């Protein structure tokens, strides 16, 4: 597949997304690339497949080309000092390990943190590397023809203990491998480019997962812990071993202009997972994934309850998802630190299992509340709405069966869904109902063979207005418009600077 299909162009004062007729040639390649996975779900219904692929042309905002070899980029801060990976012995032949070169470069450049900061430029080439850690007041910049290739040698991936809010590793309880691009306790860190590529070469990890040969939990592509002022932007991420982007215990996080691609049958290749983080903005991005395109998290059962750090003040806008077995935006299921004040708007999903899905269970505790969604366009979906109070497993037997999650004030409005099998599956918890659900101005058109029961509702309470098909009796019709906050969050006011990676 020609990854140049997905490009953003700097137009002087902001990124714009473009495509031209000459770029339609990759259409067949993309179609074939996705078909292998989608055919498993759509029974070789190429009419459905063509509808899904039409996203690349219907939404010009997702198909573009960066102008030439421009070295300008947008960042939260520019850097006074600059170096190129080849200055530290980097070899971009796709075979030579560059882990030592990355570590040497970052160690050298980190000394400028208090003197205007530094940037490391990754030039054109194929740069094989294992895990490496970034530093504060630092920018990693990938040239448009640069490809970072994640090493498949486990020796290049240090072992870490489990995250404290999870208690155990997700794949294997013993712990986890470090992420490819990693950092902890950082301030002002940027990973960007003019749409360079990070290739996780995940197939070997997916095979180990399926064959139960993993000793530790698989690595992620980009992960920051306990960090503030984080930017991840204008990159293409492909074939991650597991999750792609994972800001955890972070604040003031800006994620934008990402293209994330993985086979739709690849295990746990979530796109963007904000985890126990606050003041986060995700926008102008596109994900094809084997799992949730965005999964909002905050810790697992008793470990998340004890750690007690919520994900809150999260903005998601202008986001597109393809994921046949998962959600466009998932809340949970690991939500034991709480999730509050999520604002999602202008969301598109094609060939995806569900729009916004709330996932929780007895033992999770905490809350999911003040969730606001508006202006969603959904095509070829199993569910338009899905909430479940019986999702997922527990890390161990130490969870508290009396720890019931509180799910309330959930607002959906201005949604159009086409070719839908079930309108809604809304399942709360016995003696712990999900309350304050509001659904308004929603039009759902059904597949040719819809399920007879369109609204399956148990242990929920709420209202609806102008919804087709008619909702269940637990959502009685009222003359209301569901709320959506009109105030701005601090992350909305973050201004970007025009920087140079001329090296």
Where do the protein language model's features map onto the residues?
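Extracellular/periplasmic carbohydrate-active domains that bind, remodel
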Residues: 2-13, 18, 26-503
